[in-house]
Amino acid sequence: MMLSLRRFSMYVLRSLRLHFKKIIITLLTIQLLFITIFVLGGRSSIIDGNWKSFMALFFKPLAYTNRNNNHASFDLRSKDNVAKLYEKMNFDTSGKWIDTYTLKNNLLTVKMGPEKGQVLDSVDELRYYDNDPRLVWSVLLDHLLESDSNEYAFSWYDWANFDSTNKLIALRHTNISCQFVCEGAFDKNVLEMVESEVQEPLFVTNRNKYDESLWYNRVRKVVDSNSVQQAIHDHCMNNDAYSNGTPFELPFIISEISERLRPEVYDLQAKNHLLYSNFTPLSLTVLDSDKDAYRINLKTTDSSKSNIVQTNLLQNYIKRHRNEMVNGDLIFNHTSMFEKFLHHGSTKKRKLDVEALDKTIYAGEYLELSPSDFQFNAKERIIELETRLRSEGLPSHDTHYLRSLKTSVNTSPALQQKYFAEASDITDATADGHHRDRRFFSIGHNLLNDPQEFEARLNSLIRNFQKFVKANGLISWLSHGTLYGYLYDGLKFPWDVDHDLQMPIKHLHYLSQYFNQSLILEDPREGNGRFLLDVGSAITVGVHGNGENNIDARFIDIDSGIYIDITGLSVSSDAAKQYMSKFVEEESSGESFSALIEDYKFDENDYFDEVDGREGLAKYTIHELMEWVNSHPDDFTDAEKNLVTKTYKKELAISRSDYAEKDLSPKQRYLVNEKYNLYNCRNQHFSSLNIISPLRNTMFSGVSAFVPNRPIATLNNEYKVPAKYGLLSFQGKVYLPEFRYWFSFADMKKFANLQLKEPKITRLESPLNDLKFSDISLLITNILKCGFHSVFASLFNSFDSTVYRLKELEIQYDPSLSEEEKSSLLKTLRRGMSKKIKSPEKDPIIYIYERKLWENVEKLLNASNIYNIASQVEKEKGKEFVERSQQVYERNFDGFRLPDGGNSKTVNDLNSKGLNLFGDNKKTSNNIFGSDQKY
């Protein structure tokens, strides 16, 4: 495509200005050269041959020293700074940034492309920018404080990650067409032209594969030209605004994400589609840690034309803060601005307080639930909202919720279409596309290959969801694999790629009414998480139906597409199947299920509607619906017929099974479930009220969380939990209780030298199931020698979380303690230690930022210097880890000396309380997971 005359003119003018600046800089450098020679005489002259020391005078980077009142950048050649960066990148999980973000050093300095290194004169010259949270938060908060309005023009460009698309905007000479992003894998020639011009790789994850000829030929061989042309025709068009030189525009517009793409291609399509789609959140929900939340309403605007430059918010910010400039530069201090926002008078009107919710529920040790929490009257809620709509109007969230309710009640469970869309059609299975939201799929910086980056994402997800529900008084608890992982060390299993939580149906509806389609923003003092709360369209349906909508809601990380699955539990007519007899007999003091049913009177003539207010086909039983479909075949698509048939066959299978409920109708099943407090999600996971309630207050990933009253019973309904707490192996992982950590067995064979194949690694002499304390120090040394840096970082950073869970287990399962003693000790532990637990993983955005800085260090310093610096940092951290572990082993850990709740001067020492699961975990009596304990 030929450059337009306007673009060409702009390019010529910029080039002339750039060359003019270079001439001036060259003249100044020559002048400085002669001055230096004159001043230094023979000490550092070219004539003496000391060229390196002489040139160092000119090329020494800026350090933190602040000369002439300039805001200095971070010096990556300073060994002290490199050590500081390595320590911060691996062992500091706080929300603090390693440097400051400024107007000149960051925003106006061109980072890539032909003009790399040039400092622009004004933000009006920006064609793209990195949406660093410090920049966006500062501008947004300043706008809200200066404006009477609580509205804000939203753009995905300011909140999601557009690093790769910015590289396409930065291009001046290389023309990119739809074909580049519609082929299953990138054309290497075009890819290299792009990277040559921007002077950076377009992506990092598996970029090296494109340089392997066998791999490249294989993935390109499957590219079918006809399919590509069809994909271009159906899903992609060239962007005239880009051709005309309009800033922030991409060369093409994706109308729909294609199928069968490699992750890096899918990533680029998904980002493009997100930017140009009509889909935007209804609001922003800003967290004040886990204490409060604030609502910012969003204007209905074109996301691709509403970023902080296009709407002049950035320009206005600079004008208002011009008096803070130093030599034309300006610091964006977002945390200071956030503090100002929290304490400003106008912020009170933005505070979220849902009348039906109680924000104090997380203050106690227990939370009692009632049967009413698991029931919901859709018809009543619809009437209430429609009455308000007619009399006073409804806020956008209520309007959206009302629409969802009506859609749900009037759609048969057998005809519900799948709501959530995953990136399941990605051609690389390692991308876990089936566990990623299609709209937000991203390969991140190196998400598929860097375990620290991946675990940081999952950790940020669960921590922020828990802070979100606590700040608003919403009830949820850990479930499925997430609960199972918590059981051992207070963390997720390392093989899990998402999280699972459950809610009572009443609170699922609060979640939907007040927060559906809100972008949840983490407290910027603690991190930089951005998550879309998305509730599905089947929120009044409690039965499995056609199985297409087992998940009620998702909490989605918009920078990766990784999510939390949220399911609501309610009374329904689903069959509990193999669990029914067990649940009912437990609730009924041992009476058999058949005897109970025999005495229970059902009147099948009474009208029964599981969801009150349904109309049309939604009112039909599955038998009636199947009959209707068969008699009106032209009214249904083949897909709809298949869904109804599938649902019908499932119902028939129950009547032909040996389940206790095989002779019960849906109405009878509903009444039995209601009578005996049996609740289920749409994925047919059943539980009873006394297994769930009272919920227990605990810590998970370093933040408050609820778990069911009887976690072992809950898990044994789904898994088979080994009774013993000790050495375990599963899916190639090994749990070592001395470390409270799941190691890869392949890694362990190396750092324990189990097969004597590592001559430089001291062999572990003790068997894995009988480690001595001295083995801990040896294994830490070996882990570092073997280069398992991310493993050690994870061990170090999760120490607080895992020792908290260790002490919790020791108290909960000590048979010598009474229920009252356990309750008192657990209360002391939680209230005294919870606020001191650091996050077990880094904030992912800060980690990626520091990771990129470190990659620059690797280009600047030789490998030997880097190794020495990193080794010294890790040696000190390894020593600290062993010392803290020894304190726990000797039951002398400072962290377990906690203040008394009523008297801050009185110290409760919990070291000696409870079992000794660390120093004595080999006992056969440590079968603590054989059953639930009362506490």
From Swiss-Prot:
Changes seen on gene knockout: Eliminates N-glycan mannosylphosphorylation, when its paralog MNN4 is also deleted.
Keyword Transmembrane helix: yes
GO cellular component: Golgi membrane
Sequence ranges on the Lumenal membrane side: 43-935
Reported induction: Expression is repressed by RIM101.
Domain of life: Eukaryota
Membrane topology field: Single-pass type II membrane protein
Biotechnological exploitation: Mannosylphosphorylated glycans are found only in fungi, including yeast, and the elimination of mannosylphosphates from glycans is a prerequisite for yeast glycoengineering to produce human-compatible glycoproteins.
GO biological process: N-glycan processing; protein glycosylation
Cytoplasmic side: 1-21
Motif DXD: chain residues: 498-500
Location (main, coarse): Golgi
Keywords linked to the UniProt accession: Golgi apparatus, Membrane, Signal-anchor, Transmembrane, Transmembrane helix
Chain ranges passing through the membrane: 22-42
Intrachain disulfide bonds: none
Record's subcellular location: Golgi apparatus membrane
Function as written in the Swiss-Prot or TrEMBL entry: Plays a role in N-glycan mannosylphosphorylation and has partially redundant function with MNN4.
Domain observations: The conserved DXD motif is essential for the function, which could be an indication that MNN14 has transferase activity.
PANTHER family referenced in this protein's UniProt entry, alphabetically: FUKUTIN-RELATED (PTHR15407), RIBITOL-5-PHOSPHATE TRANSFERASE FKTN (PTHR15407:SF28)
Family recorded in the similarity comment: Belongs to the MNN4 family.
Protein name in the entry: Mannosyltransferase regulator 14
UniProt source species: Saccharomyces cerevisiae (strain ATCC 204508 / S288c)
